[in-house]
Every structure is written in C-alpha cells, then in structure tokens.
C-alpha cells in the first residue's frame, strides 16, 4: 500500500539559497522556495495497520526541511570546491571565485552538488535512516520529489530492505 504526502499542501517547505558550481546561469548564489513530496510504499503493520502514521513521516520531513530553511546549501562532496573553517566563518573557493559566510548561515550536505536531483537523494536517504532508527522495517521504497517551484522538480526512489 502507498502513502503519499503533497508537500505544497502539507506545508513541507523550505526556502534556501544554493550554487550549482560550473553551471552558466545557476552557478551564482540564488534561491528557491522548495516543497517536498513524499511517497512510501510498504506493508501495513502495527496496531492500526498503517504503512506509517502520517504524523511520524510529516515530522521527519519537516525536521529535514527546517534544517535547510534559510540556509545557503553547499555540497560537501563536490570535487572542485575547497572549504576552510576559521573563526566561525566558512571560506570556500571554486575556480577563481572566493566566498566567505558566517557558519550559522550555511549547511554543508554530503552530496556532490545542490541540484534538485541530489537534494532528492539526500532527503530519501535521511528519511530512510530516520525511519530505520524508529524501528520501521515494513517499507519497500521511499520516493521523494524536490520541487524548486510549481511545475519543476526532481524525483528519486530509494528501495529499502524489508524484514
């Protein structure tokens, strides 16, 4: 059975800035008002025969959104971006451009870029880990869509081990 959350209507949103390093137009700091759609597919389980209680999955997704909200999102695993942390300031460099920003205004994610595609993978992995930590073992897959606005987004499906 499938459970579905529409991020636009469920309030699963965050506003962040990012840079797609090397891209001709998106390679400058710019922002989006993102919303996150989530689908879970799995077996019904527990006393109430839920795939997952809506309150639980909404709380998980909202927590991740809140971690990214009003931050500059940067890719920790980009092979050509160099980072240095000094005195509560993050310095970073890509090609001939150098930046500095207070560390509390930035979040470094373990992804190679900050595209909607890589953010979808990040969200799916985070949701999977958090559900696993809560003891969920009945979910076959998680699908996450990261929407940069109405009508454009990227979707990723992560398959899980069911026990």
Swiss-Prot record:
This is Putative 6-carboxy-5,6,7,8-tetrahydropterin synthase. The active site is at the interface between 2 subunits. The proton acceptor Cys is on one subunit, and the charge relay system is on the other subunit. Keywords: Lyase, Metal-binding, Zinc. The active site is at residues 26, 70, 148. PANTHER family: 6-PYRUVOYL TETRAHYDROBIOPTERIN SYNTHASE (PTHR12589:SF7), PYRUVOYL TETRAHYDROBIOPTERIN SYNTHASE (PTHR12589). Catalyzes the conversion of 7,8-dihydroneopterin triphosphate (H2NTP) to 6-carboxy-5,6,7,8-tetrahydropterin (CPH4) and acetaldehyde. Its EC number is 4.1.2.50. Binds 1 zinc ion per subunit. Belongs to the PTPS family. QueD subfamily. Its cofactor is Zn(2+). It catalyses: 7,8-dihydroneopterin 3'-triphosphate + H2O = 6-carboxy-5,6,7,8-tetrahydropterin + triphosphate + acetaldehyde + 2 H(+). One of its GO terms (molecular function) is metal ion binding. Zn(2+) binds at residues 18, 30, 32. Pathway: Purine metabolism; 7-cyano-7-deazaguanine biosynthesis. Pfam families: PTPS.
């Amino acid at each position: 059975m499938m459970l579905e959350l529409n991020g636009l209507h469920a309030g699963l949103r965050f506003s962040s800035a990012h840079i797609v390093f090397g891209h001709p137009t998106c390679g400058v700091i710019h922002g989006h008002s993102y919303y996150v759609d989530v689908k879970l597919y799995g077996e019904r389980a527990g006393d109430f025969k839920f795939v997952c209680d809506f309150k639980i999955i909404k709380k998980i997704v909202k927590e991740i959104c809140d971690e990214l909200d009003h931050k500059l999102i940067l890719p920790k695993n980009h092979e050509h971006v160099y980072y240095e942390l000094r005195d509560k300031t993050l310095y970073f460099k890509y090609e001939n451009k150098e930046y500095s920003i207070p560390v509390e205004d930035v979040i470094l994610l373990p992804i190679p870029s900050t595209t909607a595609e890589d953010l979808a993978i990040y969200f799916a992995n985070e949701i999977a880990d958090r559900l696993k930590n809560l003891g969920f073992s009945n979910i076959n897959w998680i699908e996450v869509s990261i929407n940069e606005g109405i009508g454009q987004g990227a979707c990723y499906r992560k398959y899980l081990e069911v026990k």
